């Protein structure tokens, strides 16, 4: 009994600080267009976020639903990640209402008949710049011949402050053939510059807004996106 009591005390000593550090994040963005890594995924959308983090670990849920075009694909992403001293790793489960399963069932995970895509990622933030690599390893990601595509994406990003706003410049590329990104080999799909700032509405309330210019050299498309955060 004494040993059991000692073990319980040790567990409580470890868990209590972790409980004190648990943080919950709730928010939402409204965007004029849904652009993902240089690829258009839909028109204006509402994108809510729910995240819980503690001790470098984070579990999050992120969604997107069209608010103008009812034909836009709905999306629900679940991510589990760990960050330590600038380094981060994680896995994301992307689910789309359209895909290999014509019924759009969430709990259908069979590889060749699912609307899920599982992606692993790793990155490092140097402070003045960051680099991230993402690779799909399971789900609805196939080449035209039916083989697995293992679609991958790499992004370099650099934040800076200027002209009363917080800016981020980014360059992203796809290293190999990927129908998901619309490439048949190495291609730059994302060159973007985004500015974010808070607009004061009243003395006690400010509205965070962002505007970003994104160019996709691979698809020869360009987008100007407005975002509002809550």
Regions from the language model: what does each represent?
Residues 25-31, 51, 60-64, 81, ...:
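Transmembrane beta-strands of outer-membrane beta-barrel proteins
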Residues 57-83, 88-112:
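Surface-exposed loop and membrane-interface regions of Gram-negative outer-membrane beta-barrel proteins
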């Amino acid at each position: 009994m004494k040993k059991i009591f000692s073990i319980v005390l040790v567990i409580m000593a470890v868990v209590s600080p972790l409980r004190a550090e648990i943080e919950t994040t709730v928010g939402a963005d409204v965007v004029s267009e849904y652009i993902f890594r240089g690829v258009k995924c839909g028109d204006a959308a509402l994108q809510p976020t729910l995240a819980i983090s503690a001790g470098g670990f984070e579990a999050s849920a992120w969604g997107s639903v069209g608010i103008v075009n009812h034909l836009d694909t709905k999306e629900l992403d679940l991510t589990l990640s760990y960050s330590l001293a600038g380094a981060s790793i994680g896995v994301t489960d992307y689910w789309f209402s359209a895909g290999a399963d014509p019924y759009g069932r969430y709990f259908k995970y069979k590889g060749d008949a699912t609307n899920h895509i599982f992606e692993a990622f790793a990155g490092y933030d140097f402070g003045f710049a960051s680099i991230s690599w993402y690779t799909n390893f399971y789900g609805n990601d196939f080449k035209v011949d039916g083989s697995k595509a293992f679609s991958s994406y790499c992004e370099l990003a650099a934040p800076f402050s200027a002209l009363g706003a917080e800016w981020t410049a980014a360059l992203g590329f796809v290293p190999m053939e990927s129908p998901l990104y619309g490439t048949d080999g190495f291609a730059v799909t994302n060159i973007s510059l985004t500015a974010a700032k808070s607009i004061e509405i009243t003395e006690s309330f400010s509205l965070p807004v962002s505007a970003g210019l994104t160019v996709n050299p691979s698809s020869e498309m360009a987008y100007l996106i407005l975002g509002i955060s809550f």
